[in-house]
């Protein structure tokens, strides 16, 4: 069984020479076949996902380590889910500030799901979301980290992802792209207040990471020029990233970026 962790460490420290770590996203193909009850082809039939990676001699980008981060909320924030129909689920968060809901729809061809209704649709919803994020904290769970390590072992180095920066999180987590763009234009003062709360929330997340055993830390944003023009990038994403970079770094941790570009990265 090959130790990919050592090569992973050597690469991020610039000590690997010309060696390359192969990390294909085979897990997506594996999960789709599992969802559809389609056996793996020979000679991989019956293998677990870990066994498949080992048989191919490749490493996994182990996103599972994000489960080692536990969200902490006060008792006056209550969450529950309820079925809407066979394919849809309603998610509810009740707070002293009010209640917000979201609806997600499952895919018919894989384990994925997507928002059909976003958490925040107007300023009243946004005030509830601000209350939620202002009162959240984070805790590293060594127990959950060890569970993931038992699954993947030395197949790859565990990494953790910072939350998306303010405007990116607005698009991906809270309002969706269309709702987020309208909110930036229609209620800029409320959005600015929300972003201050969100940044403080993210700082608590980052401070939690600094005290954890994670060595490899991703800045965790996707940059899509179609929804993030230079004006918004320069106003929100760049200052937020610079702020994160100014937080104290530690010699036992390495930081890296990952971006999906919707345009020529040289532009």
Predicted feature descriptions by range:
Residues 87-95:
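Generic recognition of long tandem-repeat/solenoid scaffolds
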Residues 31-77:
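Segments that shape or occlude catalytic/ligand-binding pockets
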Residues 62, 78-80, 114-118:
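Short secondary-structure junctions
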Residues 1-39, 94, 100-103, 121-267:
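Active-site loop segments of alpha/beta catalytic cores
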Residues 101-115:
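Extended Gly/Ser/Thr-rich low-complexity repeat segments
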Residues 76-80, 95-96:
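Long, low-complexity intrinsically disordered regulatory regions enriched in P/S/T/G and acidic residues
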Residues 82-85:
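Short loop/turn motifs at secondary-structure junctions and domain boundaries
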